[in-house]
Swiss-Prot record:
Belongs to the IlvD/Edd family. Binds 1 [2Fe-2S] cluster per subunit. This cluster acts as a Lewis acid cofactor. The keyword Plastid does not apply. Its cofactor is [2Fe-2S] cluster; Mg(2+). Mg(2+) binds at residues 81, 123-124, 491. The keyword Lyase applies. It holds the Pfam family ILV_EDD_C. Its EC number is 4.2.1.9. The gene is ilvD. This is Dihydroxy-acid dehydratase. GO terms for biological process: isoleucine biosynthetic process; L-valine biosynthetic process. It comes from the Bacteria.
Length: 616
């Protein structure tokens, strides 16, 4: 039977010094011998998705203490991708994921904590904590801050829903007046919480449900709604039960690697494809799988993408539905219920509540449950009041959206598309694959061929787009923006948003070894692997080269002969130390980012560190 890890610091005369320090934190004799549970918070005033988390760690800690544990809280960093977007700050976003994972490992192992409750929310915080949880493999429950309410404003005598991306597009559109742009900006992000569409943060918080590491409702219940408080209270109680099950009953089913099994990863990716989630989730699931020592690769994602339909369509793919609408339609369990009925899920998985997938669906799928409390929870809706406070309102929809023919969530029979919302493409300059969010691609451009316009930085591409140098039919190629080449694999939300602003959203393609925001839509193909800085063929593309994209056939091709590609590769290698680097880019890269780049792998490996360079 495993011994409490914390006993290392609380048991025996030789640990008198450690106990003396524990006493200085408020512990007493009666606390020694209880499980010490880390409350891993990520409160910051920089990020709307985290601005309301300050008191929520205390809420969880109180429940841990009341349930027989000792709670000790610490904080991680949290980068707001939207605020870091479009300038040098975005270089730091993806690397912050590794810092978060490492900092959790450092704190938990340094102090020998027995278990964790992870209070996350936004883009890199949930993945970083997920990576740490699977690396450490001690009992854990995730409870996120919850989604932001959708913005609303009146334009042309019509009330429309808004989010961050609308503010960006309108702000860059020369046809939009200053007054209208300002109106949209002021209305787009009305409350605390993760941005209101199916962007990266909300996608990842939904996926923790599918992995089994968070409670039903975690991914969709609004940050402002009073019902969300119960998730935090339950997490504090439940983590003590999980911890005692493992340490006192030798029940390894309580460990995250046994909950988030390969079958659970496949379910999570199936959910992601069905709901048209962010392409960043591919990056993060691949990284998390490596921490869990699970053989889950781009090949697995490709296989799933070929058979899973799109059953949910949410902003940025449509402005009709946001996360508050997904919740009204049954949230993650609503989508999983339809996938289960279609025979597309692994049913032999459990979650942190100890329930199998069929048991969870029986209780929480709104189309079958008889539990009125569950139905009431899924009627939790927005209040439309600007606030930075969690649990500040208790408004409810008059009814649930259980229309699986024409509602937000569809059944297999009425799927938005028989093809899923994400696809993996392969070709002669993406030998290890690349990713496109098909949910955001107009049907008219699922096949697209055009001349390349090549840029060696996001900034250069933005200048060209706004300067009118990109025209209808072009394929914009942005390279040397991968994990190593950026470094940091910047998100390309500004280039894609500005293409829309210039009326080119359905007339151009954009390809990059960087990545895209969860807010991106259009023919935007990212994660090209291998990246340019790692010798990828994307580094050999020249202006005017023809690129052919065929999403239905999962193909992307540079239309050059093998001999010409080989000749260009030879010329690139002849540059010596300058080979596989941008020719003209001027970019200041800090020592910290250079250290990250020195170990970074390409996107097909999740952009994790290359363990072979560390003897791992």
């Amino acid at each position: 039977m495993p011994k409490y890890r914390s006993a290392t610091t609380t048991y025996g005369r030789n640990m008198a010094g450690a106990r003396a320090l524990w006493r200085a934190t408020g512990m007493t004799d009666s606390d020694f011998g209880k499980p010490i549970i880390a409350v891993v918070n990520s409160f910051t005033q920089f990020v709307p998705g985290h601005v309301h988390l300050r008191d929520l760690g205390k809420l969880v800690a109180e429940q841990i203490e009341a349930s027989g544990g000792v709670a000790k809280e610490f904080n991680t960093i949290a980068v707001d991708d939207g605020i870091a977007m479009g300038h040098g700050g975005m270089l730091y976003s993806l690397p912050s994921r590794e810092l978060i994972a490492d900092s959790v490992e450092y704190m938990v192992n340094a102090h020998c904590a027995d278990a964790m409750v992870c209070i996350s929310n936004c883009d890199k915080i949930t993945p970083g904590m997920l990576m740490a949880s699977l690396r450490l493999n001690i009992p854990v429950i995730f409870v996120s801050g919850g989604p932001m309410e959708a913005g609303k404003t009146k334009l042309s005598d019509k009330i429309i829903k808004l989010d961050l991306v609308d503010a960006m597009i309108q702000g860059a559109d020369p046809k939009v007046s200053d007054d209208q742009s300002n109106q949209v900006e002021r209305s787009a992000c009305p409350t605390c919480g993760s941005c209101s569409g199916m962007f990266t943060a909300n996608s990842m918080n939904c996926l923790t449900e599918a992995l089994g590491l968070s409670q039903p409702g975690n991914g969709s219940l609004l940050a402002t709604h009073a019902d969300r408080k119960q998730l935090f209270l339950n997490a504090g109680k439940r983590i003590v039960e999980l911890t005692k099950r493992y340490y006192e009953q030798n029940d390894e089913s309580a460990l995250p690697r046994n909950i988030a099994s390969k079958a659970a990863f496949e379910n999570a990716m199936t959910l992601d494809i069905a709901m048209g989630g962010s392409t960043n989730t591919v990056l993060h699931l691949l990284a998390a799988a490596q921490e869990a020592e699970i053989d889950f690769t781009m090949s697995d994602i490709d296989k799933l993408s070929r058979k899973v339909p799109q059953l949910c369509k949410v902003a940025p793919s449509t402005q009709k539905y946001h996360m508050e609408d997904v919740h009204r339609a049954g949230g993650v369990l609503g989508i999983l219920g339809e996938l289960d009925r279609a025979g597309l899920l692994n049913r032999n998985v459990k979650n942190v509540l100890g329930l199998t997938l069929p048991q969870t669906l029986e209780q929480y799928d709104i189309t079958v449950t008889q539990d009125e409390a569950v139905k009431k929870m899924f009627r939790a809706g927005p209040a439309g009041i600007r606030t930075t406070q969690a649990f500040s309102q208790d408004c409810r929809w008059d009814s649930l959206d259980d229309d699986r023919a024409a509602g937000c969530i569809r059944s297999l029979e009425y799927a938005y598309s028989k093809d899923g919302g994400l696809a993996v493409l392969y070709g002669n300059f993406a030998e290890n694959g690349c990713i496109v969010k098909t949910a955001g691609v107009d049907d008219s451009i699922l096949k697209f061929t055009g001349p390349a316009k090549v840029y060696e930085s996001q900034d250069e591409a933005v200048e060209a787009i706004l300067g009118g140098k990109v025209v209808e039919g072009d394929v914009v190629v942005i390279r040397y923006e991968g994990p190593k080449g950026g470094p940091g694999m910047q998100e390309m939300l500004y280039p894609t948003s500005f293409l829309k602003s210039m009326g080119l959203g359905k007339a151009c393609a954009l390809i990059t070894d960087g990545r895209f925001s969860g807010g991106t839509s259009g023919l935007s193909i990212g994660h090209v692997s291998p990246e340019a800085a790692s010798g990828g063929t994307i580094a050999l593309i020249e202006d005017g080269d023809t690129i052919a994209i065929d999403i239905p056939n999962r193909s992307i091709q540079l239309q050059l002969s093998e001999a010409e590609i080989a000749a260009r590769r030879e010329a690139q290698e002849a540059r010596g130390d300058k080979a596989w680097t941008p020719k003209n880019r001027q970019r200041q890269v800090s020592f910290a980012l250079r250290a990250y780049a020195s170990l970074a792998t390409s996107a097909d490996k999740g952009a994790v560190r290359d363990k072979s360079k560390l003897g791992g």
